[in-house]
Amino acid sequence: MAESQLLIHTIKDAVVVNFRHGSILDSLIIDAIARELYALVDARAARKIVLDFGGVKFLASQAVGVLITLKRKAEAIGGEVLIC
């Protein structure tokens, strides 16, 4: 199994996600991140997902599309996605 692209921990009622890479530009990395993020929503791991982009310097437009889809998926089950 491939190494996770995310560092995930829980604080109170939220799942907090940090990213292992400061540059999220490669489509294979973005696809792996998407699978992991969507799995959090599909498993209903938390109603609130906080994405911490503090260590990210570069983000491809493909990754923005992933964030939009993640937000829609979360809202469809009554959840929310927060970005910091």
Region roles according to the model:
Residues A2-R35:
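STAS-typified acidic loop motif
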Residues S23-C84:
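Amphipathic alpha-helical interaction surfaces in cytosolic regulatory modules
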